[in-house]
Amino acid sequence: VKVYENTQVNSIDYGPQTHICVTENGEIRARQILLCNAAYLTKSGFFSNTAIPVYTYGSITRPLTEDELDSIGSPKPFGVIPAESFGTTLRLTNDKRLLLRNVFSYARGFKSKTSDIEYAKKKHQVAFDRRYPDLAKIGYEHSWGGLLTLAQNGGMVFGKLGERVYGAAFCNGTGVARGTAFGKALAELVVGQNSRSIEILSNRPKPNYGLPNWITEIGVRATTKYRFMKSGLET
């Protein structure tokens, strides 16, 4: 196995015998391709104009001291998700850091700006103040964003896309859990196995064509703002 890290694929030429992935520094040739590249799958020749790209953001503290842990009840590592999906996810990691996640934004061009991360960090600080007012003064050590892909109809990509081309994408907001399940099932499918997961995923609806990007962006921004406000104290 050869792993090419930090190697952007600019285009793919799907051929009858060999597929050619064109990069800045050369070509990678493969008989078979598995596309597991989230929204970028729509730039790889399949399901164009279907992705609703959204960024969600997280912030994490430095490791807490024993006194700081005592001040919040000396909890063991935990993870709490909100009843309202646009509320705040809160975790205490094994290395004693608090991690908060909320804020969604439309990712024009599948990208996020530094100003978007700074805005999210301010919202995370509000959530920190609300939950642990005496501890919140320590702030955050790191803040970041990550891309997730939605479809207007909630559809997902899974299975054979072309001759010796397979794909899995559009986890619709649960990338770790669904991504793991998609990846395992896709590998099984490629080598000719059968499983209940393959059967379920193969019968899920595919992403439908979305509205024009400018309409989608307005809709996503309005919806996320409303849902964030509706979450109330869970944000």
Predicted regions and their residues:
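A conserved beta-strand/loop element that lines the FAD pocket in flavoprotein oxidoreductases
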Residues: 1-9
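Active-site substrate-recognition segment that forms the wall
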Residues: 9-16, 27-67, 71-163
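Hydrophobic/aromatic beta-strand patches that form the interior of the parallel beta-sheet core
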Residues: 4, 34, 166-168
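C-terminal lid/capping helical subdomain adjacent to the catalytic/cofactor pocket in oxidative enzymes
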Residues: 162-167, 171-235
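Secondary-structure transition/capping residues
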Residues: 3, 44, 135, 139, ...
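SH3/SH3-like beta-barrel fold
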Residues: 19-23
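Generic recognition of stable, solvent-exposed alpha-helical segments in well-folded globular domains
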Residues: 4, 119, 123, 178-181
